[in-house]
Amino acid sequence: VTTTHPSSRTQDAVLSVRALHKSFTLHSIDGRIVPSLHGVDLDVHTGEHVALAGPSGAGKSSLLRCIYRTYLPDSGSVRLRTAAGPVELTTLGDREMARLRGREFGYVSQFLAAPPRTGPLEVVAATGRRRGLDRAEAREAAAAALHRLNLDETLWDVDCGVLSGGERQRVNLAAGTVEPPRLLLLDEPVSALDPANREAALALIDSLAGQGVAVLAVFHDMDAIRQLASRVVFVADGRIARQGAPAELLEAVA
């Protein structure tokens, strides 16, 4: 287990985070400022699956959201290696950031955000089109992803709003992994799934490594971490406390 953080950027890193800080103002408690991330350094490489572990409130989801720019960091650097070269995400304009999302990197949150009266097939196919597929290719890729995640075809054109939590989570994961980008951020992607569908989802995520897709994922499920992760990063109080191989690190923090 290593407790050191990278100081210089690794040249072949898909994602390189340095000195990342983020705080939140709690307006309901006298405007108190609460730190969430304290100088986080992290690299993720091509085909590497990195699991973020740690207690609730440690800053794991905040880190993903700062990388994806759902949250704007207070300070620090988030660099993504794109097809055109490295790009600093913290200073990128909104239009360019929107262009990179999906094509260069993706984010699967815990909850599906789908337009009203839109079915799973169209939701997943829309992501495929944003990633460069034509309409027919996108629908074919969407169908393959939904099949792999065991979503019954009778639900493919049903309004996503009436699906169960587990069904919505599978649609969300299918959309994230269709024609996958070079980096995928996952926030508790299997938390609502029953055992059979959980295994199908984990197998799909695991297969991304063979496609060279880097994954940075938040998991509370230690079995999922053992199955998927090539490296575990343990986050505590907004800092990276330690990191290492799954068997070694999980034994150390048990």
Predicted regions: what they are:
Residues 219-220:
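H-loop/switch region of ABC-family ATPase nucleotide-binding domains
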Residues 176-177:
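ABC ATPase C-loop
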Residues 86-106:
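ABC ATPase NBD coupling module
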Residues 118-129:
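Q-loop/switch helix immediately C-terminal to the Walker
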Residues 159-163, 167:
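Conserved ABC ATPase signature
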Residues 68:
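Helix-to-loop junction immediately C-terminal to a conserved catalytic motif
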Residues 184-187:
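Catalytic Walker B motif of ABC-type/P-loop ATPase nucleotide-binding domains
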Residues 137-154:
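Conserved ABC ATPase "signature" region
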